[in-house]
Amino acid sequence: MNIRPLHDRVIVKRSEVESKSAGGIVLTGSAAEQSSRGEVLAVGNGRILENGNVMPLDVKVGDIVIFNEGYGVKKEKIDGEEVLILSESDLMAVVG
């Protein structure tokens, strides 16, 4: 994937979610949950501070993260794959 996020932006590919209920029923449409976890595919150079310095991001390519998909999260198709473009501040945790 050829994409380079700017500043404190992160590109995340959402993890697949089990589409069956505990009883084995296949869930579709609004009944199927979307995961709030994903793999970091690319990171920007960092957040620009008021003094002009750049603070590197805490996450790196390959990290599995839990994110808050709220206002400001952009969905895009890159090379046929749906990815999320979000700020590092939308990430809540690194798993593992």
From Swiss-Prot:
Q: Taxonomically, which superkingdom? A: Bacteria
Name the keywords, alphabetized. Chaperone, Cytoplasm
Any one annotated GO CC term: cytoplasm
GO terms assigned for molecular function: ATP binding; metal ion binding; protein folding chaperone; protein-folding chaperone binding; unfolded protein binding
Mainly localized where? cytoplasm
Subcellular location per UniProt equals: Cytoplasm
Keyword Chaperone applies: yes
Q: Name one GO biological process term.
A: chaperone cofactor-dependent protein refolding
Q: What CDD domains does this protein map onto? A: cpn10
Q: Disulfide pairs?
A: none
What function does the entry list?
Together with the chaperonin GroEL, plays an essential role in assisting protein folding. The GroEL-GroES system forms a nano-cage that allows encapsulation of the non-native substrate proteins and provides a physical environment optimized to promote and accelerate protein folding. GroES binds to the apical surface of the GroEL ring, thereby capping the opening of the GroEL channel.
Q: How does it assemble?
A: Heptamer of 7 subunits arranged in a ring. Interacts with the chaperonin GroEL.
UniProt family annotation:
Belongs to the GroES chaperonin family.
**What is this protein's record name?**
Co-chaperonin GroES
Gene behind this protein: groES
